[in-house]
Design a protein with these regions (language model features):
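Receiver (REC) domain active-site loop signature in two-component systems and cognate sites
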Residues: 79
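Two-component/phosphorelay signaling modules centered on CheY-like receiver
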Residues: 34-52
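Non-catalytic signal-transmission and effector/linker regions of two-component phosphorelay proteins
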Residues: 1-28, 131-154
Length: 154
């Protein structure tokens, strides 16, 4: 007489399949304006990105210290508590952050001399379109997939 396989076998197979599925890129949105931060989070989630939100640079550093490892950081410059400039200074000296591509979304001109010293990948000047933002994120996520070792050895 044939005995059917235990039912837990199917659930284990599903878990294994889920574990082997590609990981969604994780985007850290650092923006002090709650509406803008939540809107970006919702739009990026709808485009199949995982999102972590931080209201200022200090909050973003705390999330990384607790284990968050974003693939891309979207960073506003003008924020209270810790602005984007200070965040980038600390990013440059932190092994957990220094290789993460950073897209600055700001109204500040990108030709500011301080920008030359920072680990910024690109600037998106406000107002920008969601398509421009997605293209910038996609370019960084695609670069990470193609050359992951280059970011680890930097």
């Amino acid at each position: 007489m044939h005995t059917p396989a235990p039912s837990h076998h199917r659930s284990t197979t599903r878990r294994d399949a889920a574990a082997s599925a590609p990981r969604k890129p994780l985007i850290l949105v650092v923006e002090d304006h709650e509406f803008a931060r939540q809107a970006l989070g919702a739009l990026l989630s709808a485009m199949d990105y995982d999102v972590i939100e931080a209201e200022n640079g200090r909050d973003a550093l705390a999330k990384v210290a607790k284990g968050a490892r974003p693939d891309v950081i979207l960073l506003d410059l003008m924020m209270p508590v810790m602005d984007g400039w200070e965040f980038m200074k600390r990013q440059r000296g932190d092994w957990r952050l220094c290789t993460i591509p950073t897209i600055v979304v700001t109204g500040v001109a990108s030709h500011d001399p301080r920008c030359l010293e920072m680990p910024v990948v690109r600037f998106l000047r406000k107002p920008y379109t969601f398509e421009q933002l997605l293209a910038a994120i996609h370019a960084e996520v695609s670069a990470e997939v193609v050359t992951p070792a280059s970011r680890q050895t930097a």
